[in-house]
A protein has these predicted regions:
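Class I SAM-dependent methyltransferase Rossmann-like catalytic core
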Residues: 3-37
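SAM/dcSAM-binding transferase cores
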Residues: 5-10, 105, 133, 158-165, ...
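Conserved class I S-adenosyl-L-methionine
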Residues: 39-48
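Glycine-rich SAM-binding Motif I of class I
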Residues: 50-54
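Conserved SAM/SAH-binding beta-strand->alpha-helix loop
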Residues: 72
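S-adenosyl-L-methionine
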Residues: 76-105
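A short glycine-rich, Lys/Arg-flanked "PGG" loop and its adjoining helix->strand segment in the class I
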Residues: 129-141
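Conserved beta-strand signature within the Rossmann-like core of class I S-adenosyl-L-methionine
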Residues: 141-149
Length: 211
């Protein structure tokens, strides 16, 4: 654990989900839920000091993109320094609810995956559901919303996703629920972008164009 992570946890314990970063085993398990065989657009909510971000960046292709949404200014600055030479990684110091706007601003139709470790259980119900809706809207048909949480209470709120798979992962302190919420292939449009083909699961970025 870095000194920065410990310091930020002490200053903002309710914003940072755990006193220690994710274990290597958890990071690898979460990354295994994604298919990196082709270019992807991936977003991460609350990357903190970037343990998951670094694993994703190592695995994704040269034509992929990773959007990191970090509210904490110190973490955001640290992430900018870490990925300063990686044009695929975009650090956004702001709320994850900005995902649809940030995608469109950068010319991306949607995400293949959204990863989140933010503690959803502490969010007010209206904010929780609003973020779930924006996440669902921003995902490509066939895409996945992947969360790792101490509790699995989000499943009862994420009813707009058609299917979910969960596992309880013990090789982390504390143990975590890893849940993948799936968006079906049947969705036809999102946020003004038109879906053109359905050849892959999840759909790669090349399958979309601006409407």
């Amino acid at each position: 654990m870095s000194a920065l992570f410990f310091k930020r946890f002490l200053q903002r314990p309710f914003q940072i989900a755990s006193i220690v970063p994710s274990s290597k085993a958890l990071v690898e398990r979460v990354a295994s839920k994604m298919d990196f065989s082709q270019p992807r657009v991936i977003a991460e909510y609350g990357p903190g000091e970037g343990v998951h971000s670094r694993q994703i960046a190592r695995r994704m292709s040269p034509d992929s993109h990773l959007l990191l949404f970090e509210l904490d200014q110190a973490f955001a600055r640290d992430l900018e320094q870490q990925f300063a030479r990686d044009r695929r990684v975009h650090v956004i110091h702001g709320d994850a609810a900005r995902l649809p706007e940030e995608l469109k601003r950068r010319g991306f139709a949607c995400c293949d995956y959204v990863l989140s470790g933010i503690p959803f259980s502490i969010l007010k119900i209206d904010k929780k559901r609003a973020l779930l809706q924006k996440t669902h809207d921003a995902l490509a048909p066939g895409g996945g919303f992947i969360i790792y949480q101490v509790t699995n209470e989000l499943k009862q709120h994420a009813t707009l996703f058609e299917h979910a798979e969960s596992e309880y992962f013990l090789q982390n302190i504390p143990p975590m629920f890893i849940t993948v919420f799936h968006k079906t292939q049947s969705a036809q449009s999102l946020n003004g972008w038109e879906y053109r083909t359905a050849q892959r699961t999840p759909i790669g970025v090349s399958a979309y164009r601006s409407a």
